[in-house]
Amino acid sequence: MKKHYLLTIMALVLAIMPAWGAMYMVGNAPFGDWNPGNGVEMTDQGNGTYTFTTSISGTVWFVFADGQSSDWNIFNANYRYGPSSGGSQEVTVGNTYSTSKSNNNHSYKFTGTGKDYIFTFNLSSLTFSIAEYQEPQLPNPFDLPAGDVNGDGEINIADITMLVDIMLGGFANYDTRHRSDVNHDKEINITDVTVLVDYLLGGTLPQRVKEGYDYVWDDEAIPEVHLSVSLDEWNRLLSLYDANAYTTQYVMATATFVKDGETTVIDSVGLRLKGNTSRRRPEGGHGQMHQRDNTDWHHAHFGVNLRKYVDDDAHTIQGVRKIHLKWFKDDPAYVREVFCYELFKRAGVWTALRDNYCRLWIHVEGDSREAYYGVYELMEPIDKRYLKDRKDRFGASDGYLWKCRNAAAGLNNPGGDIWYDDDSDDRHTYTLETQTDEFDNARAQLIDFMNKLSNLSDSEFYTWIQEVTDVDLLLRTYAVNVAVGMWDDYWNNANNYYIYFNGKETSGYQFFFIPYDYDNTLGTSLRCGVQDDAGRHNPLQWGNDNNRLIARILKFSDFKAKYVLYLKELVEARNALMDRRSAQARIRAWQERIAPYIDNDTGEDTVIEDKPASWGNHSEYNLLETGSDNFFNAKAASINALP
């Protein structure tokens, strides 16, 4: 006959060492014997009841539970919590966590003082211990090959079974679908099953062939980019910056792209500086020309136009004509923007640009060696080539593309600063980037769009917005935007986005919203617009409703319901999108890949750190811990609180 136990755990078994903020925890203490070194007093109450009291803290907690000695199931337990006397911290019984299948050894997880702990007791030796909980990490999703459909590290009949289930309508998240495309044709069908069966019978799995844009932005590689500049051209770049920090002028260079043992060398390319508030001089101080000895290199953003001076097929990298090179300014984690653009892709937002890691070197003519600038973002520019690459999705690639910025692009100011890209250094609120010879027509179309956005009645707006845009795609885009904590955006700050009209009339076109510039996210927060906490702010009240596009759409209950649904899908664990554990698995994988390459000749940003930008207003946010200050936990809480 099984014994019944009533365990009374008195437990705030922590003390904080002020100097280091370290946590002291109870070690092993035997039932029936007090070990003063642990700071815990045990009292035998009789009838199998034991009381443990910490002398480390004056706060005493009780957790009562009834159950079988062989299977103490915390979910079925009769438990309650609360301090015996004093105290203000709460300890919550959480999920069961078993460290042993032995009937005598049991482990349970609880939360206290913002951290998770494991309480373990052994019925045979009558001992217990408490230790900080170490959560099992999910496997690196990028290491699992196509064909390992269920992600268990093996390819066998179970993967075929799961693949067939997916084909019949079974659930599959992004990673599962990716691994289900065994033959890499971007479809999941009977051919993939055939390939898997052939493999299990002794065949081989096909290798993914990456060409064109997929070759340059290959998430399985970290390519090298080498830029070689003559001394005169480098000094001219420095002088251009001194004359106007926002210069868009190019100097001539040679670019070398190295990936998977293949080297592509392109001469006579255009090199320029990029960035907004992050613009920097790449060397020295104002007025200083290149110093050959003891060079003072600085991280900076660069744009490379491979066809700036010579317009032929030889001046591309497998058809790619431009690349942007962005340093990880204000992102000690080296991951925020890469994470966001990959999340857009996972969530089905195909308008997001491509982004990946690369390593950058710069050589100035006459220097004894290249300067290693470290790990950079390799970004796809949003331009006419971006449109052509997605022509089938956009429907047409010869429409009007606008860059919107300056914290004034609310799509509510038809009399605002509207101009075209004239190769000057001017920075307009709305800049036409394509078909600039049709500026008057493009401007008239944009103004008409603004007027309708602001002035149509609610019923007219409801019909019109569904005619001119894919509302579902727009809501998915904005769900990701808000989920990652993008406060410097259209809705809140009238900033940082592109729009595209695929037709040239004032009707009969499709309008597309293109997300852009996601480095100040994932816990890098700022008091801006209507908000001051990018993690906990209400997603339904994210921005200024005078920036009407999103605000007007969400006035309608069906659109609002979709938006909330897409937000909740992002944080639901099984979808492997932005729940904490799957997000952390991807972040750790990226950081492990780039860690050997972080140290660089600028001496800047040489350590990967789990913290937001130093100038933010919520320094408590982190990405890789598990408590309430973890950004993913905070964001999930704010989303799941929505009705």
Regions found by a protein language model. Give the residues of each.
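Bacterial N-terminal signal peptides that target proteins for export
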Residues: 1-9
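Bacterial N-terminal signal peptides
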Residues: 8-17
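Aromatic-rich carbohydrate-binding modules that target alpha-glucans
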Residues: 22-59, 67-91
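Structured interaction patches on ligand/partner-binding surfaces of diverse proteins
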Residues: 71-123
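Cellulosome-associated attachment modules in secreted, modular CAZymes
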Residues: 137-209
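Conserved NTP-binding catalytic cores of kinases and kinase-like/nucleotidyltransferase enzymes
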Residues: 209-339
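Middle-to-C-terminal accessory/interaction subdomains
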Residues: 214, 220-222, 233, 281, ...
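Internal "kinase-insert"/substrate-recognition segments embedded within catalytic cores
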Residues: 297, 301-313, 318-334, 347-353, ...
